[in-house]
């Protein structure tokens, strides 16, 4: 009897450890990956831009191709729609400020809107969008771009972190 209690206690601790590990994670994925409707350009042709040093908060040189695309996607994800007139009026997304704190079904809803906004603004560069995940103060967007053999996983840190 004591051995059964000991095994049950060990099992309970293991399950609790797994639950604690995934407690602050949220994940959204469509039934079918979101696909671009038109032709997709090679990611290496993405326009050049200034490189933003995220740690020093300054511009430092130029970047192009995949690196430029990733930086652009990160800025799009954290920029509230219409906040900065230097960009197009629809640049950014409505969930930029709230998705990092959204939980449960609200995270699912906001992820769907963000995925639609990403596909709308980057449809000429993204072949498929697979998922959006959140862990603590970070978003992880997994997508497929032309010119890269594997999927691209973009990590986006909350601006308030």
Where do the model's predicted regions map?
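Immediate N-terminus of the mature polypeptide
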Residues: 1-106, 137-142, 146-161
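Periplasmic polypeptide-binding modules associated with outer-membrane biogenesis and secretion
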Residues: 109-150
């Amino acid at each position: 009897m004591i051995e059964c209690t000991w095994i049950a206690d060990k099992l309970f601790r293991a399950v609790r450890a797994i639950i604690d590990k995934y407690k602050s994670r949220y994940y959204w994925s469509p039934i079918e990956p979101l696909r671009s409707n038109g032709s997709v350009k090679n990611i290496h042709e993405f326009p050049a831009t200034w490189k933003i040093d995220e740690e020093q908060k300054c511009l430092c040189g130029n970047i192009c191709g995949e690196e430029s695309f990733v930086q652009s996607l990160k800025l799009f994800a954290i920029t509230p729609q219409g906040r900065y007139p230097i960009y197009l009026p629809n640049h950014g997304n409505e969930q930029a400020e709230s998705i990092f704190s959204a939980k449960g079904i609200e995270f699912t809803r906001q992820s769907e809107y963000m995925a639609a906004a990403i596909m709308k603004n980057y449809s000429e560069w993204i072949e498929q969008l697979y998922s959006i995940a959140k862990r603590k103060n970070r978003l992880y967007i997994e997508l497929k771009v032309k010119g890269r053999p594997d999927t691209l996983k973009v990590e986006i840190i909350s601006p308030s972190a």
